[in-house]
Amino acid sequence: MALNYLWIAFFVIAFVVALIRLIFFGDTEIFKLIVDGTFESAKVGVMDIALPLVGIMTLWLGIMNIGEKAGAINFLSRIIGPFFSRIFPEVPKNHPATGHMVMNFSANLLGLDNAATPFGLKAMQSLQEINPDKDTASNAQIMFLVLHTSGLTLIPLSIMAQRAILGAADPADIFIPCMIATYVATVVGLIAVAIKQKINLFNIVVISWLGGITLFLAGMIYYFTNFLSKEQIEVVSRVASNFILFSIIVAFILGALRKKVNVYEAFIEGAKNGFTTCITIIPYLVGMLVAIGVLRNSGVLGYIVDGFTWCFVHMGINTDFTPALPTAMIKPLSGSGAKAMMVDTMKTFGPDSFVGRLSCVFNGSADTTFYIVALYFGSVGIKRTRYAIPFGLLADLAGIVAAVFVAYLFFH
């Protein structure tokens, strides 16, 4: 229901703003821009996202099936089970969904978006199997989605690569700020959903895992900043991500071989579902992308940024960060739009400027909430999303606020 009202609001708000621009400012091109944008968004949803996703989904669902036959998913479920059983109490012990979620979070941590999406869709399908109300998002599905939308990433590889292309003196200088901001977003999302679902986080297992993850991140930050040069950080990030991913593939294959599984047939069996899954999500994907495009092309976001700037000026708050806000505002709506805005900001202000760096941290501090909701819930036919969107946006907001503070600390 929330998604229904939100979708309607995007169109109505865009229409009202466009009408004001036409009547009071003589902008005769605004409605053409919006209508052209609807066709472009629909095309992008199918040709640039859904169809390429067919190949990726086919590959990784095949690999995942090999992993399941090899027992790797159950192995991961047993390791992470004690922690996940506390924050996902609805998921039975050693259920495959646990392993699928671990694979998704791991791919996100490594910044491997192409692998994370198939893992995430598989996890959502596994959670749907134990969902008693197939039209309504379960507590476990909401927790998973909010943690996913917080976008916890250790290695923002694509952002560092874009900074290098634009000639940044130190492309990796946003590495630690991105890690801190996205970690804050994840923790806030976890706590908020746990409170809503009455999950006790003051548990020795939960505290131990969260403490261990925090120490691991702190150790990584210390090691990267004290023992590696800027160039080495980029090389290690790039090599480690792809090495770990390919190692997982080989481990799945060897594990299946050890169990005398016909590996190729297992791959084909899993890969068959790739096309079906992508066809299922196309209507949800196109509907959300068109609504987002309408809102963006109407100029609503620009007016919101101007309003924030006016408020901050009158409150006596430093407004050096406001030119980077469009990236933060577009990120929950569109990953490609946020990337384009980040690049445009760096081109306008310079990749080594405060605003340029902050736009990069914004881009790495959270994920595309509305896209993920449409994609993941659409893949399993969820129509009632309950509180998934507001809590996902809360995690995004926490990441944005953290990004501002961290950027002032590191770059201002």
Q: PLM features: what roles do these ranges have?
A:
Residues M1-G55, A164-R296, V313-H314, Y387-H412:
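Signature of multi-pass transmembrane helix bundles
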Residues V12, W60, K69, L109, ...:
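Short glycine/serine/threonine-biased micro-segments
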Residues E29-E129, K259-T348:
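Membrane-embedded alpha-helical segments and adjacent helix-loop junctions characteristic
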Residues F39, T98, D135-S138, F246-S247, ...:
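Short hydrophobic/aromatic segments of transmembrane alpha-helices and their interfaces
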Residues S41, S77, S85, S106, ...:
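Generic serine detector
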Residues L61, H95-A97, A137-A140, N242, ...:
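Sparse, context-dependent recognition of short Cys/His-centered cofactor- or disulfide-binding micro-motifs
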Residues A115-A116, A123-A164, A168-I199, L325-H412:
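C-terminal transmembrane helix pair
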